[in-house]
Amino acid sequence: MYRHACYLYIISQGGELLSVAIIKEWPSVFITSLAASTMKRRHCKLNSLPQELFDKIVEYLSLSDYCNLVLVCKRPSSKYNVIFDSTNHQHLKGVYKKTDVQITSYNEYINCICNELRQDEFYAKSSWIASICGHQRATIFSVTNKQVEMKYHLYNIAIVESEDCNGFYPFEPTRDCLICKQKNQCPRNSFIVSLCKYLEKQNVQSNFIYYLYEINT
């Protein structure tokens, strides 16, 4: 979701978007002053932008800058009011409710028929059973806080590594949530996306803490 150190300069008139510039060099605190100065202008107020455009702006902000924006505009994004992050942010506590989420993980082969192949006389003595099987090694994640798991549909999450070992993706990327029948709108999806990015950065322990940020609405 969030692209760190990227900021938007927006020019609009009469509700029509005229120009958007993505600027990387400005310090994080600039987004607060930009929001404050923009709100003072008669015809260009961030808190009066169409919701779709406001949500689009939030996509380019880090969690810290998003919280600054909420603090200034008194307006959260309808799309990103539930955020999962591996970083323990300890500032702007009035903007969000933070919950520590204990996560356990283990590895498992998916779509594996190695045992069946070993029972076949033709393959039993083969040293290439794993290659013939073509199974995938997945990391299965479980949330120990059952209240959080049920509220945000964080059940049975399996993530696999890409064949070129350059990234991770959900084992069933096109599957809708079985509870709410949604995909992109379900917090489960943002949790999976965040976990994939987390896996790319470091080796995951069997037990670790993640953080749930519920933005005040």
From Swiss-Prot:
Residues 43-92 form the F-box domain. InterPro entries: F-box-like_dom_sf, F-box_dom. CDD domains: F-box_SF. Pfam families: F-box-like. SUPFAM superfamilies: F-box domain (SSF81383). SMART domains: FBOX (SM00256). This is Uncharacterized 14.2 kDa protein in PK1-LEF1 intergenic region. It comes from Autographa californica nuclear polyhedrosis virus (AcMNPV).
